[in-house]
């Protein structure tokens, strides 16, 4: 069998990697071997941080709810317990948005939570 030279395929594969490395600094952008390593590492970072982002947002929502709840003389854990006992089913994302944008409505939720805890 004759030898098959893979010039076209090799060039296409390398071009794809270099294209993915667009925006990187120095040799990570231009040299194939270094660019390939950095693209692999970037993929690992992206995979990890897609999961990390979910945790970070949940932490942010909880922090915002806690700060708003403490303005109404209540801790975060007591507020969430009170809302659960009052059968108010609202997720943390929406609760944090209410705490930021609508102080009056959040105050009413806190009052209902306090009543449910009594």
UniProtKB/Swiss-Prot annotation:
Pfam families in alphabetical order: Ribosomal_L20 (PF00453)
GO terms assigned for molecular function: rRNA binding; structural constituent of ribosome
InterPro entries given in the database record: Ribosomal_bL20, RIBOSOMAL_L20_CS, Ribosomal_protein_bL20_C
Keywords recorded for this protein, A-Z: Ribonucleoprotein, Ribosomal protein, RNA-binding, rRNA-binding
GO CC, any one term: ribonucleoprotein complex
GO BP term, pick one: ribosomal large subunit assembly
UniProt record similarity statement: Belongs to the bacterial ribosomal protein bL20 family.
Function noted in UniProt: Binds directly to 23S ribosomal RNA and is necessary for the in vitro assembly process of the 50S ribosomal subunit. It is not involved in the protein synthesizing functions of that subunit.
Name of the protein in its database record: Large ribosomal subunit protein bL20
Organism: Staphylococcus saprophyticus subsp. saprophyticus (strain ATCC 15305 / DSM 20229 / NCIMB 8711 / NCTC 7292 / S-41)
Annotated gene: rplT
